[in-house]
Structure formats: C-alpha cells, structure tokens
Amino acid sequence: MDFFESLSKAMGLKPEQKQEPQFSGDGEDTLEKSERAQEAKSIIEDPLALNQSEGYKEKPQSLSFDTLRKMSVRNTVVGAIIQTRVNQISTFSQPARYTKDGIGFEIKLRDPKATPTQEQRDRALALESFIENCGYDYNPGRDNFDTLIRKIVRDTLTFDQLSFEIVEDRLGRPAELHAVDAATVRAAEVEVNNGEDYVHPTDIEDEDRIKWVQVVNGQIVAEFTGSQLAFGVRNPRTDLSIQPYGLSELEILVKQVTSHLWAEDYNSRYFSQGGTTKGILNMKGQNVSRTQLDAFRRQWTAQLAGTTGSWKTPVVSVEGLEYINVSQSNREMEYEMWMNYLINICCAVYQIDPSEVNFPNRGGAGGTSGGGLGDGGIEDRLKNSRDKGLRPLLRFIESVINRYVIRRFSDEFTFNFVGLDGETERERLEISNKQVRAFKTINEVRKENDLPPIPDGNIVLDPTYTNYIMQKMQLEQAREMEEQEEESSDSGIEVVPDGLDDRYNQR
C-alpha cells in the first residue's frame, strides 16, 4: 500500500472517489491542490440565531460595543495600556529599509531559501509601496498605513475585532484600503436551503455571498462579501452562539475595571466632601426643627465641602453636639495594595508589564518584593512583555494583511514585521567583537557592514588561534633556514643573513 492509498484510507474515501496523484512537470514531484470529496458536516454557527435577527447576527454579550469603547477611554489604566500598544505597533508602519535600526515591515519571498529575481524585487517594492500608501498611488486624503494600523489596533484591543474595507479594481484585486469602525460590523444572515437545511459557511463562495454588513443606528447601511471586507479576531472561540466574534479583554476585566473606577471615586470623594465626613453627627437631647437642621447642614457643607474644605475643623454653636468617628484606620480598605492588585490584573490580561505603562510592579499585588519573571531586571521584564503581548499582536496583524491583501496579488510573497529583536549600535558592535574573536574573520565582519576587505584580514582574532598561527609560521621559517644552511654547506657558500649584504659591500 503506497502513500496515496494510505491517505485515501485514512480519509475514508470510497474506491470510486480515489484519484491518481498529479504532479507538476518542474522536475520535482509537487502534489497539486486536491478537491474535497465531501461537504463539511459540522455546524459552527447557530442558524436559528442568524435567521431570527434583522438580517445580521448581533454579538451576544452583557456589554455593548458602545460600553466597551467608553471603558477603554474612561479607565486610565486600560487607556494607557491600549495607547502604549498602539504607539509600539506604529513604529513598524514604515518600510524597514527606510529606518536605521531596521524596524518596520518588509515584503519578501515566502520561500526563505529562494533568491529573488529582478522582476520579483520590483514586484516586492510595488507591494511595499501599496501597503505604505494603502493604495496604488499617494493620496493625502486617504489614510496611510500608519493611520490605518493605529485605528485597527485600537479597535482590536477594545472589541477584539478589526475590519477594513478593500476597494477592488476592475480585475478584482485590492486597489485601496480603508479602516472601518469595527463596532459597526456584524455577520450577515446565513442562507438556508428551503428553510430547512443548514448550509455550512465554507460551502458558499465568498464572491457570491454577503458575509458582513455595517450597522449604524440599528440599520444596515452597507453590505460586503468576504473579499471586500477584512475581518479579524485575536481570540476566536468555538461557541455556536458567539461565532464569528471574539473575546475582548475588557469583557474579562469588567469586574476589575468597575472596582478601579469605584476605588478612584472613593478616594476622590475626599476632595469633594472633605476629610472629616466619615462619621455621624449626633445632637443629643435636643428637639431640632427641620428649619434649624437644614440651616446647620448648609453651614456644615459650606465649611467642609470642596478641596478647600478638606481636613478643616468645623466650628459650630450647638449645645450637646457629638461627632462619632466611624473611620478607625486610614488603611481600612488597604487602598494602595488594592489599586496595585487591580492594575496588575489589567496588565496581566493585556499581556503587558506594568512598567511599560509607568506603573512599577513591586513584586506582586501586595507591593512587597517577591519572586517572579521580573527578578532579572527591567530589561528582562520588558523582553518578556514583548514576547507575551507585542509579538503575538504583530503576528496577528501580519496574518490579516497576508490573508486579505498580499495573497490577493501573489502567493510568492509574504508581509512581515521586522526589527522587534533588533539590537542597538553598541550591542551590534559588541556582538561583532565577540564573533570576530570566536568564529568569524575580520573580512567577513567587514562584508556584513558593507566595508571592503583589508589585507591579511582573513583571520580570527582568537588569542589561542593567533598563537598557533604565529608558532606555525616560526616553525616554517626555522625549517626554511635549516634547508638554506644545508644547501649552502653542500655548495660551500656562506649564508649571509638578510640585510648584511650592503654592509659587506660598503666595506
């Protein structure tokens, strides 16, 4: 049983469904794309939920898109995290060949071992220009890649949903890219045969199906096929009721964000209500009229309310007035530790180190030193933060652009962000210095830096290797001297050391 028979048996194909393998005639046996033998059986979306809607599927969630947007703006910790990630991603929004540190994006061949031809280089530069301008030509009225990427990164960190429209040319290729408010994009209503049979989404061709709609004020204002709108989520799930939407970090942090707002409000009330209001005023043994009580309340508020009244001592002329303090400790809620805990939880969910948003982590939620990933210092913590949070976000954006844009032009090329692991000039010099003393020659290092070779530069500056070469040269010189002495003794000619011939002639 050969490989293809085993593959057919594993796939459960009937004998009449088996096909002979087809190969290309390029000299290498390359298996061509095969057609599926049966339709998908699984259901990935709830058909009833889609058809009971107003032509689109609403995301079932406790928080609306508008609430998620307000949370990302009004909570300072979440806002700082999102803004930090947006700024970090924006540093990769220009071609890497334009920057000195090599940070940016590049278009290269998908096969890393292939050497590009001149035609492929020209096509890569054309694709690079298209991505940079978000279109074939420069248009100041259209978003460039920096603006586009800032918009979609903010959307994906807020809603776990990004989208941009792909305006096609006459050949069906991308001509322009326009960012779309992700909060207005919904999945279109699924098609059902005869009102009974469920149709798997993969069984419907994208060019024939309206896959996405834009909803504004509850009304559908635009419709898009799968090739006209890019849609991506970072946290996909198999839940039938959720498909095809993702899971936003803010949905996970509802309780923590609310607690943080309450804690800030609790502390800010000190300035709005004064510092001596956490107690009870008791007028003992007096029948105070409503008018007198209101007058006393106005006097008390005038003296203590606002930032100017904080921690002031009230002076009143009321007999039998007693103040009962109900705040026995200024650490009754462990305010600082509680705030530190909430900030750390928010940063953990967003996969970012608190120090990146200017909140130093003192080792844990309690603010005491302790073991953890940050023991190696700030550089180790930042590197760990980049590996956990920034790198996956960059890879996600790469996959979206490759899927919806680059692959529409050619399968030969791929879009990549580069420079995340780039070193500084000092680090590069230190690395080159170590390499030239271990396994690289001087001329090899000079070639990497676009410098011409130097005479006698094909040597590794390792002391052991250098001593070995020197000893070898000395042995060869000594052997040559012995051979010359033997030849001169046989011929009777006196061997004169180099440099002494002129002195003998002068005499």
Swiss-Prot record:
Chief localization: virion
Compositionally biased region (Basic and acidic residues): 30-44
Keyword terms: Capsid protein, DNA-binding, Viral capsid assembly, Viral contractile tail ejection system, Viral genome ejection through host cell envelope, Viral genome packaging, Viral penetration into host cytoplasm, Viral release from host cell, Virion, Virus entry into host cell
GO BP annotations, alphabetical order: symbiont genome ejection through host cell envelope, contractile tail mechanism
InterPro entries per record: Phage/GTA_portal (IPR006944)
Signal sequence bounds: none
Subcellular location: Virion
Pfam hit, one: Phage_portal
A GO term, aspect molecular function: DNA binding
One GO cellular component term noted in the UniProt record for this chain: viral capsid
Residues covered by region (Disordered): 1-44, 476-507
Protein family according to the UniProt entry: Belongs to the phage portal family.
Biological role stated in the UniProt entry: Forms the portal vertex of the capsid. This portal plays critical roles in head assembly, genome packaging, neck/tail attachment, and genome ejection. The portal protein multimerizes as a single ring-shaped homododecamer arranged around a central channel. Binds to the terminase subunits to form the packaging machine.
Subunit: Homododecamer.
Record-given protein name: Probable portal protein
This protein's encoding gene: 3.1
